[in-house]
């Protein structure tokens, strides 16, 4: 993972990647498994220095070169129910969750996306991440482990080149950026925490859809 030289707030997000195997459009949730080729591990890194600019779209935050690695391979026969998933930084567990804790299951995600977007073979949908996404730095080693899918490991390095300041928005370190990148740790810095924009603050349903196979 390459962090631009003039950026500071690169966060990990251990996730599961759903790999589409057949063209899907307006499908039923109960049929979604027929359109899934398999699953693999993903790390949906976010470059939150651009959070202010990209609020709502995440184009720069999530779309920079080298971000969102997936692997090590696609597992075709995997039951996603009640599987453990962890993110480990330099040997220390930072995220520790289970697929049972997800707001929506994999079949729901596929059916939801296919309502308005035609999914084609090779498309990837990410599952969302457990709590405690935090910033990593050059020299760190980040691994995402998902039970039954394997381990995805990345080394964080700094690019010798900064983001160009000739055009476009520049990296920032506003309260919005810091509250997202540092999460709950922002409170321990003795600072006022602004209104949360974290995923856990979104209006997830109190009752999750039942798994369907």
Functional labels for PLM-detected ranges:
Residues 14-22, 40-45, 74, 89:
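Short, structured patches in soluble enzyme cores that scaffold and shape functional sites
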Residues 48-213:
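Catalytic-pocket segment enriched in acidic/His residues
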Residues 2-10, 24-31, 57-62, 74-77:
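A generic local secondary-structure boundary/capping motif
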Residues 1-2, 139:
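Glycine-centered loop/turn motifs
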Residues 28-40:
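Short Gly/aromatic-enriched secondary-structure transition segments
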Residues 21-25, 161:
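Short, conserved beta-turn/loop elements at beta-strand boundaries and strand-helix junctions
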Residues 1, 8-16, 37-38, 66:
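Generic beta-strand structural signal
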């Amino acid at each position: 993972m390459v962090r631009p030289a003039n950026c500071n707030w690169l966060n990990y997000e251990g996730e599961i990647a759903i790999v589409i195997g057949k063209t899907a459009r307006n499908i039923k949730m109960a049929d979604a498994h027929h359109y899934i080729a398999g699953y693999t591990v993903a790390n949906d890194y976010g470059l939150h220095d651009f959070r202010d600019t990209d609020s709502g779209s995440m184009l720069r935050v999530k779309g920079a070169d080298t971000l969102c690695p997936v692997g090590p391979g696609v597992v075709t026969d995997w039951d996603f129910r009640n599987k453990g998933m962890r993110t480990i930084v330099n040997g220390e567990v930072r995220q520790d969750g289970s697929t049972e804790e997800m707001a929506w299951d994999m079949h729901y995600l596929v059916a939801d996306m296919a309502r308005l977007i035609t999914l084609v073979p090779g498309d990837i949908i990410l599952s969302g991440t457990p709590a405690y996404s935090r910033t990593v730095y050059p020299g760190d080693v980040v691994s995402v482990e998902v039970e039954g899918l394997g381990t995805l490991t990345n080394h964080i390095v700094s690019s010798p080149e900064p983001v160009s300041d000739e055009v476009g928005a520049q990296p920032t370190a506003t309260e919005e950026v810091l509250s997202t990148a540092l999460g709950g740790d922002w409170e321990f810095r003795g600072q006022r925490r602004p209104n949360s924009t974290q995923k856990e603050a979104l209006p997830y349903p109190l009752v999750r859809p039942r798994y369907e196979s």
